UniProtKB/Swiss-Prot annotation:
Subcellular location: Cytoplasm; Nucleus; Cytoplasm, P-body
Domain notes: The CMP/dCMP deaminase domain 1 mediates RNA binding, RNA-dependent oligomerization and virion incorporation whereas the CMP/dCMP deaminase domain 2 confers deoxycytidine deaminase activity and substrate sequence specificity.
Domain of life: Eukaryota
Cellular component terms per the entry's GO annotation: cytoplasm; nucleus; P-body; ribonucleoprotein complex
Catalytic activities: a 2'-deoxycytidine in single-stranded DNA + H2O + H(+) = a 2'-deoxyuridine in single-stranded DNA + NH4(+)
Site feature: Interaction with DNA: N244
Family matches, as Pfam families: NAD2
Name of the protein this chain belongs to: DNA dC->dU-editing enzyme APOBEC-3G
Lineage, top ranks: Eukaryota, Metazoa, Chordata, Craniata, Vertebrata
Family: Belongs to the cytidine and deoxycytidylate deaminase family.
Gene Ontology biological process terms, A to Z: cytidine deamination; cytidine to uridine editing; defense response to virus; DNA cytosine deamination; innate immune response; negative regulation of single stranded viral RNA replication via double stranded DNA intermediate; negative regulation of viral genome replication; transposable element silencing
Binding site for Zn(2+) 1: H65, C97, C100
Job of this protein: DNA deaminase (cytidine deaminase) which acts as an inhibitor of retrovirus replication and retrotransposon mobility via deaminase-dependent and -independent mechanisms. Exhibits antiviral activity against vif-deficient: HIV-1 and simian immunodeficiency viruses (SIVs) and also simian foamy virus (SFV). After the penetration of retroviral nucleocapsids into target cells of infection and the initiation of reverse transcription, it can induce the conversion of cytosine to uracil in the minus-sense single-strand viral DNA, leading to G-to-A hypermutations in the subsequent plus-strand viral DNA.
Cited SUPFAM superfamilies: Cytidine deaminase-like
Length: 377
């Protein structure tokens, strides 16, 4: 450790960690930023060569932020280890501000032998366009070095507790809403960084063969439009995709369907009273419970219209059909995806690398057959 660097501590107190690493998306009063770091060689199985903590205030000059303190320390440390390749991991209570994000991007461009993964507890000023652009420059691949940014989940919080907190042997106890807040922040970061889906994931999960089996995940792609002068205007800041959360004793014990994760996300957008149209493209139509909750949402939000295009119809031989009828009766438009919707999703939500959408055998026939089933419902 370098004793000349100020504001470095060996471990933080448990109450400090619990207070500052709270992952509630909107919080006030957390004006100190904590950054826990680990430096490793490219051998991920080895122990960290260096691990410690920086802290700094949000509002003084950027040089006082913990990200800048880390860069100052690391550049000095790096002079003694010039030829090695290193993997650096940060666990940060707030994501970097605009100036810090730009400085980190410059640092990575100057030292391509360093890779950086940033786990953040919360997103800082994520609604500001200049901040969004700075994070995209930092994280998006453009033929050169870039950072990987992720939202802290249970495993990362537990790791920080074990490695950076003076817990006196006590286990980490997550907050009740940690998994829900993680889902919201994960989706928001995906919107901000414009995450895209792997092509294989799309073709596997959105294949519309009626007899497909083994697809236990539901993917939901979405876009939002606002009415302006009798025209629907696409809101690029609210466009992305979600999938259902699998059962997890540290997350959602019973799992959480993609539709419910999406309903959790919408209030986070803070839409005003203008007219909005939300369009979902789902790999499966909603189950009964999700359909009921979506129907309740549009009944309580008359300024939001809902369109659902499903690749396949989910039917558990139970009340799914009743749920779809309720959703339709309460004003939602429900349809089966055809070629144009599949192509739109491919062009918009998939990392297609410039490749055009290639329909699979029977796409049109399956779409027509499923449309007939939906009309009968």
């Amino acid at each position: 450790m370098n004793p000349q660097i100020r504001n470095m501590v060996e471990q933080m107190e448990p109450d400090i960690f619990v207070y500052y690493f709270n992952n509630r998306p909107i919080l006030s009063g957390r004006n100190t930023v904590w950054l826990c770091y680990e430096v490793k060689t490219k051998d991920p199985s080895g122990p960290p060569l260096d691990a410690n903590i920086f802290q700094g205030k949000l509002y003084p000059e950027a040089k006082d932020h913990p990200e800048m303190k880390f860069l100052h320390w690391f550049r000095k440390w790096r002079q003694l280890h010039r030829d090695q390749e290193y993997e650096v991991t940060w666990y940060v209570s707030w994501s970097p501000c605009t100036r810090c994000a730009n400085s980190v991007a410059t640092f990575l461009a100057e030292d391509p032998k360093v890779t950086l993964t940033i786990f953040v507890a919360r997103l800082y000023y994520f609604w500001k366009p200049d901040y969004q652009q700075a994070l995209r420059i930092l994280c998006q691949e453009r033929g050169g070095p870039h950072a990987t940014m992720k939202i802290m989940n249970y495993n990362e919080f537990q790791h920080c507790w074990n490695e950076f907190v003076d817990g006196q042997g006590k286990p980490f106890k997550p907050r009740k809403n940690l998994p829900k807040h993680y889902t919201l922040l994960h989706a928001t970061l995906g919107e901000l960084l414009r995450h895209v889906m792997d092509p294989g994931t799309f073709t596997s999960n959105f294949n519309n063969k009626p007899w497909v089996s083994g697809q236990r995940e539901t993917y939901l792609c979405y876009k939002v439009e606002r009415s302006h002068n009798d025209t629907w205007v696409l809101l690029n800041q609210h466009r992305g995709f979600l999938r259902n959360q699998a059962p997890d004793r540290h997350g959602f014990p019973k799992g959480r369907h993609a539709e419910l994760c999406f309903l959790d996300l919408i209030p986070f957008w803070k839409l005003d009273d203008q007219q909005y149209r939300v369009t979902c493209f789902t790999s499966w139509s909603p189950c009964f419970s999700c359909a009921q909750k979506m129907a309740k949402f549009i009944s309580n939000n008359k300024h939001v219209s809902l369109c659902i295009f499903a690749a396949r119809i989910y039917d558990d031989q139970g009340r799914c059909q009743e749920g779809l009828r309720t959703l339709h009766r309460d004003g939602a438009k429900i349809a089966v995806m055809n070629y144009s919707e599949f192509e739109y999703c491919w062009d918009t939500f998939v990392d297609r690398q410039g490749r055009p959408f290639q329909p699979w055998d029977g796409l049109d026939e399956h779409s027509q057959a499923l449309s007939g089933r939906l009309r009968a419902i």
